[in-house]
């Protein structure tokens, strides 16, 4: 073998697929992902993972992606993040949030501003919805200096047929994230949210709101949930409804969120109650950031300045997914996250300490 052949950082399995591609793109290091569902009846990449790789190709220049005949091995040699304007058609197997979320890791470090129109389903049970990204993830970006970032809902599209359109615009282009120091728990001052529907009776929206308020009424803070009823050509191709709730700290600017959508035959009041209970659980099992915001915060801290950053996290957040993330960061960036208790009296929270790698936005330099 030639000595000039690239050395690949190798991963196995389909878990953390998007983030491994994102980390490789940020680091510029080639990776190899093998044994992707090799033991399944339908082995290899799913259609949405192939679609995600196409999206990565469209926002980078010089990336090389090789997929084996069986689809169980992917070799990725990252190029430069260039961004720009594009349209991405999402498969019906995943909502637009599955594709928007990883772009939040890349867009601020691009050569050009990101302007991507995503078409497809706008909500699902398992992936981030539009409001969760707008009110939950983008505020985390703002904490790291990414302030000009927006997600516009042009059309809602409920499963299974979708028909939604979402426009991601990221105008902030920064050299590197600012250093994070957040060692306190934010105090929740208000709960906001939106209950939405497409091609169904507007009464379902009010019933979801009533169900959520029934759970949240005893909280010592303001609760404001708005109704968002979509009709006509902007309401997609399928009937559907859902609710997103966000707990906010006005003093600190942090937020937690919970969301879900209704299924055929489900009761709107029960969905509202369920999501409200999920929000309360998220608050109780979080510290500075929620469970679904933690990966974004950790990655931004890793690629920050060569300074020590600190973030308060809850022990409940140290799960298998978090451990896999830390191992992947160690493999690609060769840096570690150190965890220590807040103090002897506090057995719930830990302080995550990270020294930034001094990442530099090479795309911006080339620009």
Curated annotation (Swiss-Prot):
Pfam family, one: RTC
Tree of life domain: Eukaryota
Major subcellular site: nucleus
Residue numbers of N-acetylserine PTMs: 2
Example GO biological process: endonucleolytic cleavage of tricistronic rRNA transcript (SSU-rRNA, 5.8S rRNA, LSU-rRNA)
This protein's UniProt keywords: Acetylation, Nucleus, Ribosome biogenesis
Disulphide linkage map: none
Effect the entry attributes to changing residue 327 to A: Impairs the interaction with BMS1 and affects pre-rRNA processing at sites A0, A1 and A2
Compartment list: Nucleus, Nucleolus
Family: Belongs to the RNA 3'-terminal cyclase family. Type 2 subfamily.
NCBIfam families in alphabetical order: 18S_RNA_Rcl1p (TIGR03400)
Subunit structure: Interacts directly with BMS1 and the U3 snoRNA to form a stable subcomplex. Component of the 90S small subunit processome also known as 90S pre-ribosome that consists of the 35S pre-rRNA, early-associating ribosomal proteins most of which are part of the small ribosomal subunit, the U3 snoRNA and associated proteins.
Function: Does not have cyclase activity. Plays a role in 40S-ribosomal-subunit biogenesis in the early pre-rRNA processing steps at sites A0, A1 and A2 that are required for proper maturation of the 18S RNA. RCL1 activates BMS1 by promoting GDP/GTP exchange.
Additional remarks: Present with 10000 molecules/cell in log phase SD medium.
Protein's UniProt name: rRNA processing protein RCL1
Gene: RCL1
